[in-house]
């Protein structure tokens, strides 16, 4: 691959960001042409990209040809499918004949990791059948702040060891079903009082406190073979000494995630359209800072 193609492979975008309305619902010729200029590594589908079950399946099946014809590797075809009431783009769309699973908080409250494995197998099973190969799940956040506005029932709970056990078995189940899991949101979004979708989200945990709690599920996910970790736009000033989001921090990514936790897989940034980033950086600057980190 050329240098331009190799750089392009670092990006995952929404389909319509490549060719506008022509690529929102279909892996069209316009999308194929756009890949010649923007050879991205994959796409993530949201509700606006899902009109019918057949349309989604066709898009995902035909995407491979678009990428192959552009001379770049087959794409990551991703979706946010955590399960439960809040973040399950496929199951909650009403378009697909798939079973819905409970919130992860309910699964965690059972204390039975086998239930988490069943959820992972169920979600990844139907995603693979539809044509997805990446799921931005499981949520590895430890819910230590009961007033957290964004994680809540998406987390397995407040016990880091239990959350870690649930995350680890879910990772293994998803891999066995043929879908790549992505543990999120490092270094942990469960302690914040803010929602990073709308603005800055801050944890005041020290490095020692994070290591004893928030990092535990990520360590277990990594030990279970998780190939991807999503870094959130969470400020950790007691660790970094500044207000830089973790997604743009070399200390958090290279120093902690790669160094202390020994992660050698793919590091994914949360969306650069979220308030925690765009209120301080434009998307282009944020992307460069993330790659540098």
Model regions and ranges:
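Short beta-strand/loop segments at the ligand-binding rim of alpha/beta enzyme cores
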Residues: 4, 11, 76, 178-181, ...
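Short helix-capping segments at alpha-helix termini
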Residues: 66-73, 176-178, 225, 259-264
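Enzymes and membrane/adaptor proteins characterized by extended Gly/Ser/Thr/Asp/Glu-rich
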Residues: 16, 33-163, 185, 190-204, ...
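Phosphate/pyrophosphate-binding betaalpha-module
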Residues: 166-187, 193-196, 206-228
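Boundary/entry segment of secreted carbohydrate-active catalytic domains
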Residues: 1-25, 270
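Structural motif corresponding to alpha-helix initiation and N-cap regions
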Residues: 25-29, 215, 283-284
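Structured alpha-helical segments in the cores of large, soluble enzyme domains
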Residues: 30-36, 135, 174, 215-224, ...
């Amino acid at each position: 691959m050329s240098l331009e193609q190799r750089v392009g492979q670092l990006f995952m975008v929404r389909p319509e960001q490549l060719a506008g309305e022509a690529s929102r619902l279909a892996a069209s010729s316009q999308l194929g042409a756009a890949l010649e200029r923007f050879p991205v590594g994959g796409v993530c589908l949201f509700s606006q990209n899902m009109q019918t079950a057949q349309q989604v399946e066709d898009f995902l099946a035909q995407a491979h040809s678009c990428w192959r014809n552009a001379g770049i590797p087959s794409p990551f075809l991703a979706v946010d499918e955590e399960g439960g009431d809040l973040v399950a783009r496929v199951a909650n769309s009403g378009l697909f004949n798939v079973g819905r699973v409970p919130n992860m908080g309910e699964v965690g409250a059972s204390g039975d990791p086998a239930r988490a494995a069943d959820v992972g197998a169920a979600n990844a099973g139907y995603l693979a059948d539809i044509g997805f190969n990446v799921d931005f799940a499981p949520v590895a956040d430890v819910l230590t702040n009961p007033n957290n506005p964004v994680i809540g029932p998406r987390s397995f709970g407040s016990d880091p060891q239990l959350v870690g056990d649930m995350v680890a078995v879910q990772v293994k189940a998803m891999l066995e079903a043929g879908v790549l899991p992505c543990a999120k949101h490092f270094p942990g979004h469960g302690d914040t009082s803010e929602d990073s979708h709308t603005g800055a989200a801050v944890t005041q945990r020290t490095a020692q406190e994070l290591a004893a709690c928030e990092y535990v599920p990520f360590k277990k996910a990594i030990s279970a073979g998780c190939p991807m970790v999503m870094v959130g736009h969470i400020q950790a000033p007691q660790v970094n000494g500044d207000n830089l989001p973790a997604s743009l921090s070399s200390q958090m990514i290279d120093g902690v995630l790669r160094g202390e936790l020994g992660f050698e897989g793919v590091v994914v940034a949360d969306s650069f359209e979220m308030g925690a980033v765009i209120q301080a950086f434009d998307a282009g600057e944020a992307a460069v800072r993330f790659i540098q980190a």
